[in-house]
Design a protein with these regions (language model features):
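Conserved beta/loop motifs at nucleotide-recognition and modification sites
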Residues: 1-348
């Protein structure tokens, strides 16, 4: 399920590509963020502008981290381009938060010649430590781009194009549901789109096609489970829980954290519903990216009273304490928690 970090700025990918092509390559880039599919597309465009003939052994150099050899980098930067106007130095996975001599690296980057472009390409998990002098320098003196998850409209349009390439048309609701169950990162969605396109019998991809074969994130499965609880479909809710726990990768304590987060979001949505605050308020409070998810959350919250949701949050906290401080079986504790939530407890 797509959640948004506080005060996260959305990257306008098309605008960044336009600026790159119109203004030309800069000297130093810091490319990072979770949306690695768009990061690689941007990097490819940048490479093509710098070294149109491709990754030769003269104008193009690549260095892989996490360690960084400053002498090797200096030699690559100083090397004159051969049969091209520019040279391109690609640094992959260098741990910029732990560079041994940040001052020396900063000095080196300050003197990158106009004919050279240096690109630090970070993994999707990388998060720059803004307290460090080197990171501050990079943010203030280079082209720093954080490749964020895209807006719902942009992602839906992209999904539609991917399905069209398979000869399929996807319903809007099905595209939104795919984002909901499989997440909003493009590289994760590509194999799911391929699976769903291969499975769908007709020319139109529906929600049922997505549900049949797409990978469901634990957050989406828990959302489905609480939907069942809200509709008093207790057997269906327990079936979903058993399915979730049948995956050995889903540890009970990790699933408890997901369930606790969902109950807190439902409580916030129920409060918003009582005060007629709408989906935009729920999106802000619950850090949700898409209004379709917020609307579904509000609808589900109406199946519980505020007191039931408050008690459910308390039960999650109590279960967390028991898992961490007692010898009780975590799986049984989690099942007991869900039974008590399903029973609609309102008081201790």
């Amino acid at each position: 399920m797509a959640k948004k970090k506080k005060d996260e700025k959305q990257l306008n990918y098309k605008e960044e590509i336009r600026l790159l092509k119109s203004g030309g390559p800069a000297r130093v880039y810091l490319l990072w963020g979770p949306e690695d599919y768009l990061r690689e597309l941007y990097l490819q465009t940048l490479k093509e502008l710098c070294v149109p003939e491709g990754e030769d052994g003269f104008s193009y150099k690549r260095m892989d981290g996490p360690e960084l050899n400053l002498q090797e980098l200096s030699d690559a930067i100083d090397a004159l381009p051969f049969l091209t106007e520019r040279s391109f130095v690609e640094l992959r996975g260098v741990d910029l938060n732990r560079v041994k001599d940040g001052d020396a690296l900063q000095k080196l980057l300050e003197d990158v010649p106009d004919y050279c472009t240096v690109a630090f390409v970070q993994s999707a998990a990388f998060e720059p430590d803004g307290r460090l002098k080197l990171i501050k320098f990079l943010k203030e003196n280079t082209v720093e781009l954080k490749f964020t998850e895209q807006t719902q409209d942009a992602l839906v349009n992209w999904i539609a194009k991917r399905f069209a390439a398979h000869g399929k048309r996807v319903e809007l609701e099905a595209a939104q549901h795919l984002i909901f169950v499989s997440g909003d990162l493009m590289n994760r969605l590509i194999p799911e789109i391929e699976k769903v396109a291969a499975y769908a019998k007709g020319d139109v991809v529906t929600v049922s096609d997505v549900d049949a074969v797409a990978h469901h994130l634990p957050e989406a499965v828990v959302f489905e489970m609480t939907d069942h609880l809200a509709r008093r479909e207790y057997n269906a809710a327990m079936e979903v829980l058993n399915e979730l726990l049948s995956d050995k990768n889903n540890e009970p304590i990790a699933m408890l954290a997901v369930i606790g987060g969902q109950m807190r979001r439902l409580y916030a949505a129920r409060l918003a519903a009582e005060k007629n605050l709408g989906a935009s308020y729920v999106m802000e409070v619950c850090k949700l990216r898409y209004d379709s998810i917020a609307s579904r959350l509000i609808a589900s919250s109406r199946g519980f009273s505020l007191q039931q949701l408050k008690r459910a949050i308390e039960l999650c906290a109590e279960t967390d304490y028991q898992m961490k401080s007692s010898s009780s079986d975590d799986l049984e504790l989690l099942k007991e928690l869900m039974l008590r939530i399903a029973a609609g407890e309102t008081h201790a």
